[in-house]
Amino acid sequence: TKIDPWFIERMKNIVDYKHKLSEYNTLEEIPAEVLREAKVLGFSDFQIGRFVLKTKDTNMEKEVLAVRAQRKKLNILPAVKRIPTVASEHPDLTNYLYMTYAVEGYDINYYKNEKSVIVLGSGAYRIGSSVEFDWCSVNAINTARKLGYKSIMINYNPETVSTDYDMCDRLYFDELSFERVLDVIDLESPRGVIVSVGGQIPNNLAMKLHRQSVPILGTSPVNIDRAENRGKFSAMLDKLGIDQPKWSALTSMEDVQKFIDEVGYPVLVRPSYVLSGAAMNVCHDDDELRRFLEAASEVSKEYPVVISQFMTETNEIEFDGVAQNGEIVEYGISEHVEYAGVH
């Protein structure tokens, strides 16, 4: 393989421990030292739930929470450490933090009832999106500080301005997962969490956090779900009598074929809760439709895939607005130079 044996041996350690976890069938069976070692090796609650509880569900929310509850019961909690920015040449008292199970203790003090908010960043960049999310994240942090709130940022992309530790009161350079965000919330006890400025990754966490009674600032997670879930959004437009291209939720290939016979090609395949239109495609024939439906179902396993009539050579006009208490306070209208659907 031309891969150094050192790396292969480390990977084998992880695979061996995966097999060890698979020997258990309930979380209560796992000895505390085994569960602790699994966390030290980097296994997430999601992975532990998958290997121990043998669940094939893609969501795993219930299982993740069960592993979390068992961890907390056994007092297996992550430590919070500072990231040194001066190569350990002298004590470094930055607010640049990460979580680990390899050691114990906190490098900082936590105080209850602090006036603070957590902002979830955009995570990994992809071509065509993310810089705007970073701009929004930085503005959210600055606004929170101006309003007298302690600003806490969770993001792991070193290319962003929001991961400059001078920008906020505390920066957690860590993953934007359900598990890790809950870890930070448990420690910080914020007044609220802002998910609306980080793009798709925070949006995907909104409903899960909402179900754990985490206060989400801004747009309600229920309304985020109504916009992100293609089926719910299209059904809402129908209910409100707002014109839209003909559409159908994917239930079976027979229903898809009936829809195609009715509207003809081209059609637009639209998965839900995806980053920057991932797996969203225009199909012009049966072969493309089958191929793109498989791709869309793969990236959007938990949510419906919607097929819409695709209108060619049409203008696309976009409206972005900010509302407060049911009234629009700021908005912008733009017309795309290219035809609708190109971007």
Spell out what each predicted region is:
Residues 17-37, 44-55, 62-65, 73-343:
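N-terminal beta-alpha lobe that positions the nucleotide/phosphoryl donor
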